[in-house]
């Protein structure tokens, strides 16, 4: 199933079968991706047209919504999913189906105009980036959309994106569309069907983008595997303070400890958690306390401004904790999960076997063996030879670390402890 549906599509189907809440959707197989590059866009769109229309109708029936309808709109996400996990390499588009008429209907239906226009400006930005090719290629390239956002915030004296009001979000939509026209010569498509096909083809195209090609070479992933495309009904983490989005791990990916952990943001969507525009909060109270200690934040400020999900949304946390345990036991491995909470209802958007350090790799394999989740042969197979080298590097003594005075923190660029000259860049 994974070979055809990709890791994401296969795991979504499997989660649905075992009772984990996932939004309804459908997956276009990896075989179609290969045909896309062999036969061309026009032939593949023609071949898929009827099947995609039927699948959208099926989602409409399950959700009680209509794709492209101004009064009761169905919005969808379009996501890539190769059979091997390729985090961050492929493209995703959220909130697809919005246009100038649908956004008005969405605002009226939800009674939340800010949510509707926040979703719209995100969609226009993603569509411009992914489908119309406006995403910066190099690190130093200026992102035209982020430059517009920064300009609007500076003009209004705003610091954070979530402080923008409805009028400012409407202004962003207008400025984004003008930037698309100026840079690409194309008009942002108002027809949701055109948007859908643009997104599906863009995800197939992302299989051959520079990032994906380099990652495949590094990881030994064959080009002919292709990517699947998963189209799902949207669920929204940006509908207010009872909504959220987050990522979590069933065990510690750095140390391998059997410790549920992760981050979330209230009233946020998609990549906000990892984008750096807001400080994410920790899933567990224990994790929140450790984070606050590392950051030098008092308990009073932590509890008031950065409470854990366990404290702020105890019922949702209980469901999330139970389901992450269920998924780890189902897959017999540490899981990396993405979720959204829409007005108090939890939805899972993805699960996959989590990436881990060499130290965590060995500890997780041995712990799962002792817990009876895997056998000795599987435990040995889980220990990748190229990662065992990480265990041979010198490390700091744990007792010395406890006593040491921390000057600053950063992300390790290599395994083990290191000493040398500090270079600022």
PLM region spans:
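Nucleotide/phosphate-binding sheet-loop regions of phosphoryl- and nucleotidyl-transfer enzymes
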Residues: 1-408
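Long, structured protein-protein interaction/assembly regions in large complexes
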Residues: 412-425
């Amino acid at each position: 199933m994974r070979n055809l549906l990709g890791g994401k599509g296969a795991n979504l189907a499997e989660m649905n079968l075992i009772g984990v809440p996932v939004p309804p959707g459908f997956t276009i197989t990896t075989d179609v991706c290969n045909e896309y590059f062999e036969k061309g866009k026009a032939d593949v769109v023609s071949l898929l047209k009827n099947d995609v229309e039927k699948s959208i109708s099926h989602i409409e029936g399950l959700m009680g919504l209509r794709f492209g309808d101004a009064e009761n709109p169905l919005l969808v996400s379009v996501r890539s999913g190769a059979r091997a996990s390729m985090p961050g390499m492929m493209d995703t588009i959220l909130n697809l189906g919005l246009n100038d008429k649908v956004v008005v209907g969405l605002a009226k239906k939800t009674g939340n105009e800010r949510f509707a226009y926040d979703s719209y400006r995100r969609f226009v930005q993603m569509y411009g980036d992914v489908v119309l090719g406006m995403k910066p290629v190099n690190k130093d390239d200026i992102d035209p959309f982020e430059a517009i956002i920064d300009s609007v915030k500076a003009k209004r004296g705003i610091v954070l994106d979530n402080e923008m009001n409805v009028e400012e979000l409407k202004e962003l939509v207008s400025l984004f569309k003008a930037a698309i026209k100026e840079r690409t010569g194309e008009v942002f498509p108002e027809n949701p069907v055109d948007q859908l096909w643009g997104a599906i083809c863009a995800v197939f195209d992302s299989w051959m983008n520079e990032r994906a090609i380099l990652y495949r070479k590094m990881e030994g992933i064959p080009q002919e595997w292709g990517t699947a495309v998963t189209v799902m009904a949207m669920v929204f983490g940006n509908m207010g303070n009872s909504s959220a989005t987050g990522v979590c791990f069933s065990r510690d990916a750095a140390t391998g400890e059997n410790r549920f952990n992760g981050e979330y943001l209230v009233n946020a969507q998609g990549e906000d958690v990892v984008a750096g525009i807001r400080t994410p909060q920790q899933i567990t109270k224990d994790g929140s306390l450790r984070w606050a200690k590392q950051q030098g934040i008092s308990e009073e400020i932590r509890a008031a401004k950065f409470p854990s999900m366990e404290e702020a949304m105890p019922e949702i946390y209980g469901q999330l904790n139970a389901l992450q345990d269920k998924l780890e036991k189902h897959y017999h491995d540490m899981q990396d999960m993405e979720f959204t909470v829409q007005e108090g209802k939890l939805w899972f958007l993805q699960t996959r076997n989590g990436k881990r350090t060499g130290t965590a790799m060995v500890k997780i394999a041995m712990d799962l063996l002792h817990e009876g989740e895997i056998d000795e042969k599987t435990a040995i197979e889980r220990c990748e030879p190229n990662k065992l080298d990480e265990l041979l590097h010198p490390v700091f003594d744990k007792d010395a670390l406890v006593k040491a005075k921390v000057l600053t923190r950063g992300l390790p660029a290599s395994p083990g402890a290191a000493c040398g000259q500090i270079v600022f860049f």
